[in-house]
Amino acid sequence: MNFLAHLHLAHLADSSLSGNLLADFVRGNPTQAYPTDVVDGIFMHRRIDVLTDNLPEVKEAKEWFRPETRRVAPITLDVMWDHFLSRHWAQLSPEMPLPEFVRYAHSQVAMILPDSPPRFVNLNEYLWSERWLERYREMDFIQRVLNGMASRRPRLDALRDSWQDLDTHYDALESRFWQFYPRMMVQAKNKQL
């Protein structure tokens, strides 16, 4: 899962949106550095990552990547799941339109920015102003996201080429998303994540 799905599942679980978004920027045990609700959100994010990576549907999808891009498949898939969530938001979360959810999420996350790591603050400058969460629905934007990550981290250069795998297996990936994501939504609502 990437930013949008983590925020969405956190919202469904009444968990800290801030902690769930911050988690990738926090190493080790966060309990001394953040309030309890943010810490709980960080741990929820970590559980979701482990759960998602071990889902049969996700394991199967990783195998569809070519040998030269399989190493980055987990990252590419995380971004792609956000694409499908953004694209089908109205169907999956009809009670709150995506732009309204994004405004709400931004207001929640903004509260912790003064005490956040610089890399997280930097991400937030672009995430909200450039409307990433809403633009995930556009495949051109997904390609831009993958290229941007590859540019910032040369060891992840294969992300650029992983675009072809997404394009080739788009329909099958969308089908797998529909198999597991609604299930995760139920787990979130039942506080099982």
Swiss-Prot record:
Keyword Lipid metabolism: yes
UniProt keyword terms in alphabetical order: Fatty acid biosynthesis, Fatty acid metabolism, Hydrolase, Lipid biosynthesis, Lipid metabolism
Enzyme Commission designation: 3.1.4.14
One Gene Ontology term of the molecular function aspect: [acyl-carrier-protein] phosphodiesterase activity
Broad EC category: hydrolase
Hydrolase in keyword set: yes
Signal peptide from the UniProt entry: none
Highest taxon above the source species: Bacteria
InterPro entries with a match to the protein in the record: ACP_PD, ACP_phosphodiesterase_gpbac
GO biological process entries: fatty acid biosynthetic process
Reaction catalysis annotation: holo-[ACP] + H2O = apo-[ACP] + (R)-4'-phosphopantetheine + H(+)
HAMAP family xref list: AcpH
Family from the record: Belongs to the AcpH family.
Role this protein plays: Converts holo-ACP to apo-ACP by hydrolytic cleavage of the phosphopantetheine prosthetic group from ACP.
Name of the protein this chain belongs to: Acyl carrier protein phosphodiesterase
Organism: Enterobacter sp. (strain 638)
Top-level taxonomy: Bacteria, Pseudomonadati, Pseudomonadota, Gammaproteobacteria, Enterobacterales
Gene that produces this protein: acpH
